[in-house]
Design a protein with these regions (language model features):
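Short glycine-enriched, charge-decorated loop/helix-capping segments at active-site entrances
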Residues: 58, 133-136, 293-298, 356-357
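N-terminal Rossmann-like dinucleotide/flavin-binding domain of flavoprotein oxidoreductases
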Residues: 287-336
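Rossmann-like dinucleotide/flavin-binding elements
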Residues: 247-279, 285, 320-335, 343-357, ...
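Flavin-dependent oxidoreductase catalytic cores
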Residues: 1-256, 260, 264-276, 284, ...
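Short amphipathic alpha-helical segments and helix-helix/interface helices
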Residues: 109, 145, 193, 308-309, ...
Length: 403
């Protein structure tokens, strides 16, 4: 049965934390964290909403902060000057949080301001902190975190959907932060800092804020990244996200279709040194991502196309043919050694889908049926409209908003 921690439990927890810090030191870690946010144990002690204790660990703000203070002090004692001790701390909470509780978070930070070696600042709201680009602008947490450096001399790390080097540099130069916390951007491009340092901004695979990386936590699936298709493959021997084996023949390759898959195949084959022809039926390249970027809030998705085009345009061994629809005979007549079919797919208009695995057979005659492809092409229906969403992901809501 759940119960409140007694004094013995707290002593045991502190012992576990000290031993963990010592193991990190012995393993040559540079930083050891005291994690006081995101609903973990220390968050429960800090909040008056969850800490109902009547002993020295409950009641006043000072008492509710006692365990956090003890862990910081004991961790510093254990690691000595071998490791820095950082505190992950929230300066804001859920949308319904009272102003009094928000003020208390700030008062506590001032009270502990000089105790750790580094402050890693966030807000206690995953929805906003890890917000998708559809709803949250880049650097959207600045208003919550801009005060932190005014109350401590210690280095400060902040987060908040950073993607652009310009935004990152701006916050550092304006004294908002000392370090940028960039988890999703480093998933999209592990070499982001080096590319900024080297001035290779056009080579950065900027995060698009779609959060496909984070969805795996809830679905129990391996991590993925729309911008970085090699993400999650670190287990492979000699794996490197940007180093690909050179070509092993003089074969020529035809890639049919310049959507995301076709562009990535062309980029990778071109990097390997193969002669590549990329044929696209339309004038505009990018396929579905170009169209989806026109939907409300998805403009940043166009980076999937832009990054790959920028890389392809540098390659003298790649030819791009726009407005070049190919039949099967056309493909064979090219005489290439290999063909990559990357023509993608279109949305069906007969109701066939995941939960309805057969076409509708009872639609009224004359019913104006449109697909997401039609909506993205500018065919907006007039009058009352029913949206049948068998995808249950993002498209149904976006089509509704677009209409």
């Amino acid at each position: 049965q759940p119960r409140s921690m007694d004094k013995a439990d707290i002593r045991e927890f502190r012992r576990w934390h000290r031993e963990a810090a010592l193991r990190a030191k012995q393993a040559d870690f540079d930083i050891v964290y005291v994690y006081a946010t995101h609903g973990y144990l220390l968050s429960h002690f800090l909040s008056p909403q969850t800490n109902l204790r009547t002993d020295e660990y409950g009641g006043s703000m000072e008492n509710r902060t006692r365990l956090l203070r003890e862990l910081i002090e004991e961790t510093k004692e254990v690691v000595g000057d071998r490791c820095a001790v950082a505190v992950r701390y929230s300066v804001g909470g859920d949308d319904g949080e009272t102003s009094q509780l928000t003020e208390e978070r700030r008062d506590r930070l001032e009270m502990l301001a000089e105790l750790p070696d580094l402050w890693d600042i966030n807000i206690n709201n995953y929805y906003q902190e890890m917000g998708v680009s559809r709803f949250f602008r880049e650097g959207s947490l600045e208003e919550h975190m801009s005060f932190v450096k005014s109350v401590t001399t210690k280095p400060v790390v902040t987060v908040g959907r950073f993607t652009s080097p310009d935004t990152m540099a701006s916050q550092v130069k304006r004294g908002i932060t000392d370090f940028i916390g960039a988890a999703r951007p480093s998933i999209a491009d592990p070499f982001l800092p080096n590319k900024i340092k080297e001035g290779r901004l056009e080579d950065i695979r900027e995060c698009i804020g779609c959060n496909i990386c984070y969805t795996g936590d809830g679905l129990g699936t391996p991590i993925r990244c729309t911008q970085n298709p090699t993400m999650g493959e670190e287990y492979r021997r000699n794996w490197h996200p940007e180093v690909i084996a050179n070509k092993d023949s003089d074969s020529q390759v035809l890639v049919v279709g310049a959507g995301p898959a076709g562009l990535e195949a062309t980029r990778a084959l071109g990097q390997r040194g193969y002669r590549v022809m990329l044929a696209e039926a339309m004038r505009e390249l990018g396929g579905r991502v170009t169209h989806e970027a026109t939907l409300p809030g998805l403009v940043e998705w166009v980076r999937v196309r832009d990054y790959r085009l920028q890389q392809i345009e540098k390659m003298t061994n790649v030819e791009v043919f726009r407005e070049s629809e190919l039949s099967a005979d056309d493909v064979f007549s090219t005489g290439v050694d290999h063909v990559v079919i990357a023509t993608g797919a279109t949305w069906r208009a007969d109701g066939f889908g995941r939960s309805h695995p057969y076409p509708f057979d009872s639609l009224a005659a004359g019913t104006n049926i449109l697909t997401p492809d039609d909506i993205m092409a500018g065919r907006i229906p007039q009058g009352p409209t029913l949206i049948y969403d068998d995808d249950s992901f993002y498209m149904g809501g976006l089509v509704a908003e677009k209409i």
